[in-house]
Amino acid sequence: MKAIVWSKDQCPYCDQAKALLKSRNIEFEERNIMHDWTREQLLEAVPNARTVPQIFLDDELVGGFTELRTKLTESK
């Protein structure tokens, strides 16, 4: 399983999502919209995104941290 995490600095839910992925040994690519990526690129990937994190697992949009936690709990 591989993940993409759209994030920004000083975002507690982004930090929690990355920590959860690390604890499950799931590789992820972080796309920080305050550094190497833009908000426009995020909106191309997730047109209705209103918040970060926006998380993809194996190229499928999961949603934010709460949805990620639910999905990973269900797949245990």
What are these regions (language model features)?
Residues 1-26:
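Local sequence-structure signature of Cys/Sec-based thiol-disulfide redox active-site neighborhoods
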Residues 2, 43-44, 74-76:
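C-terminal alpha-helical interaction module
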Residues 12, 37, 63:
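Short alpha-helical
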Residues 15, 40, 70:
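Alpha-helical elements of the RecA-like P-loop NTPase motor core of helicases
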Residues 29:
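Conserved beta-strand positions in the Rossmann-like core of class I SAM-dependent methyltransferases
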Residues 32-48:
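Thioredoxin-like thiol-disulfide oxidoreductase module
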Residues 46-55, 65-66:
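Structural micro-motif
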Residues 57-76:
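Non-catalytic, surface beta->alpha helical segment in thiol-disulfide oxidoreductase systems
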